[in-house]
Design a protein with these regions (language model features):
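Polytopic transmembrane helical bundles with strong interfacial aromatic enrichment
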Residues: 1-154
């Protein structure tokens, strides 16, 4: 395995573990370190998407079988988690930073958003961890034809 793939895989796992782990912690803690973790979470999410994009392009560019379909669903779940965190948690962080008076409202909103994002990130992790173990499509099905056609096999 080339060193670039090893490095990208390690960065991808580390960034995703930090992003998901801090999201799970914030979902359970009521947003105790919300303001301090928001930017590092976004940086980890961007790094996870960048390295995942490289890995996907390098390892799965010529196939769209069951494994790749599960990976696509996992990517969609993690993208939805990022959108929830950007939109809802970002708004709560701005409200807390601007001193909008009552801190309980923005913290409760951010906690709920982190709970939604945590579920989505858990689904993404399950999909990415299991995608490689799915059996290939049976020969003669439309799924198998799509995979062999995309790989250039006749």
């Amino acid at each position: 395995m080339p060193y670039a793939l090893i490095f990208a895989a390690a960065l991808h796992v580390l960034a995703a573990v930090f992003w998901a782990g801090s999201t799970f912690a914030l979902a359970r803690s009521g947003g105790a370190a919300l303001e301090r973790l928001f930017k590092p979470q976004l940086a980890a999410a961007v790094l996870a998407f960048a390295t995942g994009g490289y890995l996907g392009h390098t390892l799965h560019a010529h196939a769209f079988g069951r494994g790749e379909q599960v990976l696509l669903a996992a990517i969609a779940a993690s993208a939805a988690a990022l959108v929830v965190q950007l939109a809802v948690v970002g708004r709560a962080v701005r409200a807390l930073r601007d001193g909008a008076g009552d801190e309980a409202g923005p913290r409760a909103l951010a906690t709920a958003a982190h709970r939604v994002a945590a579920v989505l990130l858990a689904l993404a992790a399950i999909g990415m961890a299991t995608a490689r173990y799915l059996p290939p499509a049976p020969v003669g099905t439309a799924d198998a034809a799509a995979v062999s056609g995309s790989a250039g096999v006749q």
